[in-house]
């Protein structure tokens, strides 16, 4: 079984979000599981630099200009790169310029990604041809459409990491990207009068996966589906929509071996975690005190992530004696709000605007509770890191958060399945109730330690996801 992942980023070569973490870990787990997996990526500069052994395997003249297909290896995984400097070698992010405007030719840049994914199944590399093309998010959404146009030379899987991003472009570009006009209708890639790369993936793929079972159910409902609920409900009824939970890359996220921590620890040596807390309190300008619970946020500062709720609930958290350490960037209003809180409550609130991968490890190793109060969350990795590090997640019951965290209710404590704190409604009062429950558990140190050990014993390894995908691929054959 040969499988090609088609996507736009891969950790640690290039990362703008959780998609990169998935592609940085899943292929290696699948190779260990016995699948011959390779990855196809655009030749962005950071990716090119990270794979210096890449060599040319094919050259083509395409609708987007002349390209070369390169092949190399990264961490034991075979990686194809689309070498097209006129499309991919630019300042700014992979998707927009330094002024945050989307590149005007994104329709070509990412149509090409899908096209090459399809051409791989048609023999673009004469020595390797995938049985399954596995496309990820809107950037790769046209791969299943091109496969359909070519008579489906391979099976296709499309994974939705976040349905909110739909890859919308003017209808006139259908000629530019060399797809038939017959595809431009509601039973195809048309959405609200435009081309939707996301809908192309959803409509033409043989199977759709979402990154958690709960998110797979949620996206069949109007409040989560962004207008795609009819199609997704149909795919669910056909048995062509399922959820496969993301995993944790234990080579990178493990408190036992994490070199970024001041003190490494296991579930049997949790007392060693205290030194990480002390170091984090010093680094964030907080009062050094191991008797108070240290809450943390590592997130984009957006309303989707529920960070406005944290700001609203913060006075209640501080009144009960808690501390907050925040690392993140995003909405300027939220940034200013948290910076103002830090200025008003020195020693109790510490804020770093920006994102630093290394410092996020130090926060995870030092905090007591990680806050993830998202309004929606397809999977979420932050809470998985929290579980792994014995930093109890406090989450809203949605998407992957609902699948991975069990509330520390009396019943769950008795059954030995409690692993954090869960609240239902997306408002500050509901969040504060969960914060209050965290303080109550904190006041019972032996019970707190019991829940930490439960959380750290949970298995969210990529091997579990790899097995689920292997079973799916073989069902499609």
Curated annotation (Swiss-Prot):
Record: residues binding ADP-alpha-D-glucose: 15
Catalytic activity: [(1->4)-alpha-D-glucosyl](n) + ADP-alpha-D-glucose = [(1->4)-alpha-D-glucosyl](n+1) + ADP + H(+)
GO BP of this protein: glycogen biosynthetic process
Keyword Transferase set for record: yes
Superkingdom per UniProt: Bacteria
Gene Ontology MF terms: alpha-1,4-glucan glucosyltransferase (ADP-glucose donor) activity; alpha-1,4-glucan glucosyltransferase (UDP-glucose donor) activity
Alphabetized UniProt keyword annotations: Glycogen biosynthesis, Glycosyltransferase, Transferase
Annotated pathway: Glycan biosynthesis; glycogen biosynthesis
One Pfam family cited in the UniProt record for this chain: Glycos_transf_1
GO cellular component: cytosol
Broad EC category: transferase
EC number(s) reported in the record: 2.4.1.21
Transmembrane is among the record's keywords: no
Entry-linked InterPro entries: Glyco_trans_1, GS/SS, Starch_synth_cat_dom
Summary of the function given for this chain in its UniProt record: Synthesizes alpha-1,4-glucan chains using ADP-glucose.
Family per record: Belongs to the glycosyltransferase 1 family. Bacterial/plant glycogen synthase subfamily.
Name of the protein in question: Glycogen synthase
Organism: Salmonella arizonae (strain ATCC BAA-731 / CDC346-86 / RSK2980)
UniProt lineage: Bacteria, Pseudomonadati, Pseudomonadota, Gammaproteobacteria, Enterobacterales
Primary gene name: glgA
């Amino acid at each position: 079984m040969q499988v090609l992942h088609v996507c736009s980023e891969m950790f640690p070569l290039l990362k703008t979000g959780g998609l990169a973490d998935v592609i940085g870990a899943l292929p290696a787990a699948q190779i260990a599981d016995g699948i011959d997996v390779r990855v196809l990526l655009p030749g962005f500069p950071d990716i090119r630099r990270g794979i210096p052994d890449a060599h040319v395997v094919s050259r083509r003249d395409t609708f987007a200009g002349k390209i070369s297909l390169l092949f190399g290896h990264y961490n034991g995984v075979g990686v194809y790169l689309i070498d097209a400097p006129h499309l991919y070698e630019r300042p700014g992010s992979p998707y927009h310029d330094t002024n945050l405007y989307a590149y005007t030719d994104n329709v070509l840049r990412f149509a090409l990604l899908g096209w090459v994914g399809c051409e791989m199944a048609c023999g673009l590399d004469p020595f390797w041809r995938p049985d399954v093309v596995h496309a990820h998010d809107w950037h790769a959404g046209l791969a299943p459409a091109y496969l359909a146009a070519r008579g489906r030379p391979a099976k296709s899987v499309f994974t939705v990491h976040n349905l909110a991003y739909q890859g919308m472009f003017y209808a006139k570009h259908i000629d530019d990207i060399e797809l038939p006009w017959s595809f431009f209708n509601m039973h195809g890639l048309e959405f609200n009068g435009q081309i939707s790369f996301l809908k192309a993936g959803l409509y033409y793929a043989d199977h759709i996966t979402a990154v958690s079972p709960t998110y797979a159910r949620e996206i069949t409902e109007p409040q989560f589906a962004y207008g795609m609920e009819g199609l997704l409900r149909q795919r669910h009824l056909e048995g062509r929509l399922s959820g496969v939970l993301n995993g944790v890359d234990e080579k990178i996220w493990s408190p036992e071996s994490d070199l970024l921590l001041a003190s490494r620890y296991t579930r049997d040596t949790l007392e060693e975690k205290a030194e990480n807390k002390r170091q984090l309190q010093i680094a964030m300008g907080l009062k050094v005190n191991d008797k108070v619970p240290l809450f943390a946020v590592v997130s984009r500062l957006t309303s989707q992530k529920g960070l406005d709720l944290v700001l609203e609930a913060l006075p209640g958290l501080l009144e009960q004696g808690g501390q907050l350490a925040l690392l993140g960037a995003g909405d300027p209003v939220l940034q200013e709000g948290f910076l103002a809180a830090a200025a008003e409550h020195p020693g109790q609130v510490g804020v770093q605007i920006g994102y630093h991968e290394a410092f996020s490890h130090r926060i995870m190793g030092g905090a007591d509770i990680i806050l993830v109060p998202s309004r929606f969350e397809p999977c979420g990795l932050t809470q998985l890191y929290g579980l792994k590090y014995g930093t109890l997640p406090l989450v809203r019951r949605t998407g992957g958060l609902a699948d991975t965290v069990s509330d520390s209710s009396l019943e769950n404590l008795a059954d030995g399945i409690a692993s954090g704190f869960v609240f239902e409604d997306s408002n500050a009062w509901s969040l504060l109730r969960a914060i209050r429950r965290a303080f109550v558990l904190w006041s019972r140190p032996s019970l707190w330690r019991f829940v930490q050990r439960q959380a750290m014993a949970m298995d969210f390894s990529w091997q579990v996801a790899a097995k689920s995908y292997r079973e799916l691929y073989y069902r499609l054959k």
